[in-house]
């Protein structure tokens, strides 16, 4: 018995040791599980709190709270919607009651909480005061998104020189009903004024006279810009910008998404600010609304390293005449000051001095050119030139416009679509990926988001419905008469050819270079020159 008992003792001890080891292992496992679950639980809690308002505030509530905090908006409002820091101070009635939100409740989300109504009232004390002038024949579907997008950026005044579709009563009455918009119609009286204007009687623009299509438009734009300078000065504007309705300002590099902020930071000795242009690069042939469907753009030469630009030139050009389909010399904004004059549609000048200009390193003009397949035929229909290589040189300044006009005038619909896909649409994913990585192409979503939010908020429909209900026919007709008769100064457009000889004989020789036309970006033949620089 003793012997048997002597051999059992180690067995009991071993069993006890095994049980203790198992308990220790179980404790360690539970501890590890607890340590794993704890941070996960905290992360989930933080996410829930942020989602319910514990983190970044809801845009609508941020807009409301900014009105009760620091005048001009709070830091929170800067963080959510840059450039809109003055919303609360703009209109005293903006936040009178919570029911004001219903004005924008056209969608399930508070997609555009910046203003309480479509009028976009702007505090007259805000500086700088910016105006845009344009010459257009477009419809409301293009003008309204373009205009209200720039209102979001801080533009307060628009001088619209309208003709064609834009001058029809159903469209012009809507435009005239919008605060800050001046509509100028192309009438006989306007043309007579412009025939007596200073720049019509000077030589620097004369090489563009009496030519059709793009040349005629270029002269009209310049004469309209001359008139707009006078209107801008009378309205107390600080800056004036000439922009087409297929172009949007992209204020990259500013502390806020705001053209006003961008220009506020410009040194006081600068007279002109140049925005290099980016060109839309469509990825489909069925685009209907470029402003909300196009997000890819080709960057300007000025915003690219020279070796990248010329190294990728062939892939970026895709057998087209130039790097860009159309112009590449950007647009500019000028300080409204004495002796200011246009220097073509892309630049400004001064009669008494050489303007001090700067070129922005990040901000750009987004040019939505040939972004719809229908742009081929619409441009063709506006021009009566013959579709020959010689005659198109008389009508168009840029090579791609000439080629597009010939195709649109001579090809079948199927051939036009095939040509459009080959020369305009970016369908090759590998090429796109390569150029995006190299920085030639870039994605820009901000304008798309802003305009889509405007559309969802009901801003555009509010403008149209308000104009329809509030403008009587009598008031509308009188407003047209007032718009055309109250302009006391400046210019009008193209005098008839009968007066050509008289006009030339009386023309003043101005010691200045010819007006700056739309120019293509540098080509490969200039690569050596730019590399040496």
UniProtKB/Swiss-Prot annotation:
GT92 domain ranges (all copies): 137-377
Q: Where is the composition biased (Low complexity)?
A: 13-22, 88-99
Glycosylated positions are 24, 201, 470, 484
Subcellular localization(s) per the UniProt record? Secreted, Cell wall; Cytoplasm; Cell membrane
Q: What else is known?
A: 'Kobito' means 'dwarf' in Japanese.
Q: Which GO terms describe its molecular function?
A: glycosyltransferase activity
Q: What is this protein called?
A: Glycosyltransferase-like KOBITO 1
Q: Which domain of life is it from?
A: Eukaryota
Q: Which family does it belong to?
A: Belongs to the glycosyltransferase 92 family.
Q: Which Gene Ontology CC terms are recorded?
A: cytoplasm; endosome; extracellular region; Golgi apparatus; Golgi trans cisterna; plant-type cell wall; plasma membrane; trans-Golgi network
Summed up, the tissue specificity of this protein is: Expressed at low levels in both light- and dark-grown plants. Accumulates especially in the elongation zone of roots (at protein level). Expressed in the roots regardless of the light treatment, high levels in the uppermost regions of hypocotyls in darkness, but low levels in light-grown hypocotyls.
Q: Which residues form the signal peptide?
A: 1-43
The reply to whether Membrane figures as a keyword in the UniProt entry is: yes
Stated induction or repression of this protein's expression = Down-regulated by light in a phytochrome A-dependent manner, via protein destabilization and subsequent degradation by the 26S proteasome (at protein level). Reduced transcription in light conditions in a HY5-dependent manner.
Give the protein's biological function. Involved in the coordination between cell elongation and cellulose synthesis by promoting the expression of genes involved in cell elongation and cellulose synthesis. Acts as a regulator of plasmodesmatal permeability. Mediates abscisic acid (ABA) and sugar responses essential for growth (e.g. seed germination, stomatal regulation and ABA-regulated gene expression). Required for normal organogenesis by promoting cell elongation, regulating cell differentiation in vascular tissues and maintaining root meristem identity.
Keyword match Secreted: yes
Per the record, a Pfam family?
A: Glyco_transf_92
The source organism is: Arabidopsis thaliana (Mouse-ear cress)
What EC number(s) does the entry state? 2.4.1.-
Question: Which keywords does UniProt give here?
Answer: Abscisic acid signaling pathway, Cell cycle, Cell division, Cell membrane, Cell wall, Cell wall biogenesis/degradation, Cytoplasm, Developmental protein, Differentiation, Glycoprotein, Glycosyltransferase, Growth regulation, Membrane, Secreted, Signal, Transferase
């Amino acid at each position: 018995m003793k012997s048997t008992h002597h051999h059992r003792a180690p067995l009991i001890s071993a069993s006890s040791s095994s049980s203790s080891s198992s308990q220790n292992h179980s404790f360690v496992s539970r501890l590890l599980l607890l340590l794993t679950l704890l941070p996960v639980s905290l992360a989930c809690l933080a996410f829930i709190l942020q989602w319910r308002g514990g983190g970044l505030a809801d845009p609508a509530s941020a807009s409301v709270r900014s009105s009760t905090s620091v005048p001009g908006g709070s830091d929170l409002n800067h963080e959510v919607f840059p450039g809109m820091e003055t919303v609360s101070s703009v209109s005293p009635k903006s936040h009178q009651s919570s029911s004001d939100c219903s004005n924008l409740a056209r969608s399930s989300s508070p997609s555009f909480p910046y203003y309480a109504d479509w009028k976009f009232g702007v505090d007259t004390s805000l500086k700088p005061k910016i105006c845009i002038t344009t010459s257009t024949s477009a419809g409301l579907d293009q003008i309204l998104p373009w205009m209200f997008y720039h209102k979001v950026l801080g533009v307060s005044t628009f001088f619209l020189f309208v003709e064609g579709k834009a001058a029809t009563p159903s469209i012009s009455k809507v435009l005239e009903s919008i605060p800050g918009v001046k509509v100028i119609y192309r009438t006989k009286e306007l043309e007579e004024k412009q025939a007596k204007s200073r720049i019509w009687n000077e030589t620097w623009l004369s090489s563009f006279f009496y030519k059709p299509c793009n040349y005629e438009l270029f002269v009209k734009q310049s004469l309209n810009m001359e008139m707009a300078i006078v209107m801008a000065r009378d309205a107390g504007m600080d800056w004036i910008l000439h922009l087409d309705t297929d172009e949007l300002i992209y204020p990259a590099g500013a502390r806020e998404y705001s053209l006003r902020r961008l220009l506020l930071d410009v040194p006081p000795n600068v007279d002109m600010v140049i925005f290099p242009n980016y060109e839309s690069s469509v990825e489909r042939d069925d685009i209907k609304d470029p402003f909300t469907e196009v997000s890819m753009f080709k960057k300007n030469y000025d915003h690219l390293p020279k070796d990248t630009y010329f190294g990728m030139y062939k892939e970026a050009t895709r057998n087209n005449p130039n790097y860009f389909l159309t112009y590449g010399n950007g647009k500019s904004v000028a300080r409204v000051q004495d002796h200011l004059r246009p220097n073509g549609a892309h630049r400004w000048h001064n009669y008494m001095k050489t303007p001090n200009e700067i070129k922005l390193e990040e901000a750009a003009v987004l040019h939505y050119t040939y972004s719809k397949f229908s742009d081929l035929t619409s441009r063709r229909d506006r021009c009566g030139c013959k579709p020959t290589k010689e005659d198109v040189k008389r009508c168009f300044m840029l090579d791609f416009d000439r080629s597009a006009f010939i195709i649109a005038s001579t090809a079948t619909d199927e051939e036009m679509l095939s040509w459009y896909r080959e020369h305009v649409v970016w369908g090759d994913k590998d090429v796109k990926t390569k150029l995006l990585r190299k920085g030639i192409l870039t994605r820009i979503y901000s304008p798309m988001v802003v305009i889509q939010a405007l559309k969802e908020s009901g801003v555009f429909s509010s403008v149209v419905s308000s104009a329809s209900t509030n403008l009587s026919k009598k008031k509308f007709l009188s407003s047209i008469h007032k718009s055309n008769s109250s302009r006391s100064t400046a210019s009008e457009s193209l005098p008839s050819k009968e007066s050509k000889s008289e006009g030339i004989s009386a023309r003043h020789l101005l010691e200045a270079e010819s007006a700056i036309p739309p120019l293509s970006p540098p080509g490969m033949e200039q690569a050596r020159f730019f590399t040496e620089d």
